[in-house]
Amino acid sequence: MLLPLLLSSLLGGSQAMDGRFWIRVQESVMVPEGLCISVPCSFSYPRQDWTGSTPAYGYWFKAVTETTKGAPVATNHQSREVEMSTRGRFQLTGDPAKGNCSLVIRDAQMQDESQYFFRVERGSYVRYNFMNDGFFLKVTALTQKPDVYIPETLEPGQPVTVICVFNWAFEECPPPSFSWTGAALSSQGTKPTTSHFSVLSFTPRPQDHNTDLTCHVDFSRKGVSAQRTVRLRVAYAPRDLVISISRDNTPALEPQPQGNVPYLEAQKGQFLRLLCAADSQPPATLSWVLQNRVLSSSHPWGPRPLGLELPGVKAGDSGRYTCRAENRLGSQQRALDLSVQYPPENLRVMVSQANRTVLENLGNGTSLPVLEGQSLCLVCVTHSSPPARLSWTQRGQVLSPSQPSDPGVLELPRVQVEHEGEFTCHARHPLGSQHVSLSLSVHYSPKLLGPSCSWEAEGLHCSCSSQASPAPSLRWWLGEELLEGNSSQDSFEVTPSSAGPWANSSLSLHGGLSSGLRLRCEAWNVHGAQSGSILQLPDKKGLISTAFSNGAFLGIGITALLFLCLALIIMKILPKRRTQTETPRPRFSRHSTILDYINVVPTAGPLAQKRNQKATPNSPRTPLPPGAPSPESKKNQKKQYQLPSFPEPKSSTQAPESQESQEELHYATLNFPGVRPRPEARMPKGTQADYAEVKFQ
């Protein structure tokens, strides 16, 4: 308190601490450098030694300034000079006569920062310094910027109004100067305006997007100014849409284009992240679409870019992925073809038999039965990407595809026995291979070989064989009686055997046999049946039956008589044949009896008859099983079966055999009751045969 009192006395304050003097002013005033500020102030003093016409003078001084000799920073006393540094900038705008001491400070400078006090003079008594009630002026750096009000998005071709305001205005302060600069205004130009705000109108163009617009505010002649720059956002449809891919959390890369659409290959189970971004104003709505199915989408204010994660890609994830970007001004889209590669899966064979339209699905190791002669179509099917190379093999050999364009299809128009075996479909792929096999089993109806019979000491022994798939069953019929097992009276004995597709059966008949013996062997399976019969027919006078029933002597006699007749016939024919040609002809030995040429036509089911048109007993499908009769014994007989008789002695008139020829074969036809001539087609080409008919009356 002592220092202000001392200063008051030194500076001529005669009314120090007089309670009749008071002043109201803010203690601290802050102003940015270069700006203008008004400091409101009011004061009061006693009405003593002055009248209404007495002039009142007010002064603002910097602290520690001698009021009688020092220069004030501002005063209303015209004859009193002010400080040079504040001249024209500091102004006492208040009327001291009315108790107003307001001060305006323009273009504040850093050196203006100080403590200021007010002094009043009126008449001889009022001479007072308000030393304790001044204010402190603080000058700061100019950091404040003007505010620009502009729509967030500008429509191209539509006029827009922009306002620039600097929020620092006082009534006594002069307004700043506003100006505008920017690429959008280059063709229109702007002029500086003096006001507390500025209004700008212009028409944005599409190319004005992302350009700058700046509002400048100037406060003094020394170039102190403030400015605010805004970035123009002119609306436009989505553009520059970009798709990128991240594999297994690696940095995203753009896919390589293949044609007009980028192409991406990924292995099954791999992690993929598809990213989509587009440039648009306002921000576009992004979406990922797979075959018209929306997988992911984002709002305009959502994160950018839009990601689509495929943690472990599957075969079903393959397809065309489309990213769409859309706003009110338009849309844009871009596609990506994703191919998920994987090795063959679910390899199987589809089967169609006999031209059926229904396909049967078979797995690995399946056995497939097919009837001989039917058509068969095998289709190998698998799932893989890229498609696997398919091929068919049998017994290690690659089969030619039925359709070169589709090697997985194997067609067998007519299944034959040689097709039987394992067929394998191979599916080869860079990522792995698979194969599937099926076993083809060819089924066919029985093929009968036999029956054939021979006389033995115990009686008549007959054998019969048949080949079929599945293996056939054999049974014997004696007349209308089925012979099964063994007879309790030991009159017959049946012995079956089998080996693979062959079935064999032996029949032994004991005891006397009737003259009307009819013995039949029947073979059957699920696909058909075939039978062959052996007949022993009686002659009208009972010669043959008597020979069999009355014993060996009578049989020998009849046989000798027969051979005697044949010998006479041969002797009669041979001279004629020798005169016809000198070239020796091969001769065939015969070991037949009178019963050798009794024609017996075997009966068979429809399937067996059909098979008999394709194959003969002379070419069996597989090697004959043990005990089966040789087909050579049936040569030139065409399903004629006989009961063998005793051996025939050679005629003494026959020429001896040469090394390269055999005995000449002659035929004797026995007709019961009439003659059946043999067809000429049965004779070998170039061979002449003579026939003699022997009739039993």
UniProtKB/Swiss-Prot annotation:
A motif (ITIM motif 1) lies at residues 595-600. Changing residue 119 to A: Disrupts interaction with CD24. Residues 18-121 form the Ig-like V-type domain. Residues 572-697 are cytoplasmic. Putative adhesion molecule that mediates sialic-acid dependent binding to cells. Preferentially binds to alpha-2,3- or alpha-2,6-linked sialic acid. The sialic acid recognition site may be masked by cis interactions with sialic acids on the same cell surface. In the immune response, seems to act as an inhibitory receptor upon ligand induced tyrosine phosphorylation by recruiting cytoplasmic phosphatase(s) via their SH2 domain(s) that block signal transduction through dephosphorylation of signaling molecules. Involved in negative regulation of B-cell antigen receptor signaling. This is Sialic acid-binding Ig-like lectin 10. Contains 1 copy of a cytoplasmic motif that is referred to as the immunoreceptor tyrosine-based inhibitor motif (ITIM). This motif is involved in modulation of cellular responses. The phosphorylated ITIM motif can bind the SH2 domain of several SH2-containing phosphatases. GO terms for molecular function: carbohydrate binding; phosphatase binding; SH2 domain binding; sialic acid binding. Glycans are attached at residues 100, 355, 364, 486, 504. Disulfide bonds join 36-173, 41-101, 164-215, 276-323, 380-425. Coiled coil: none annotated. Residues 620-629 have a biased composition (Pro residues).
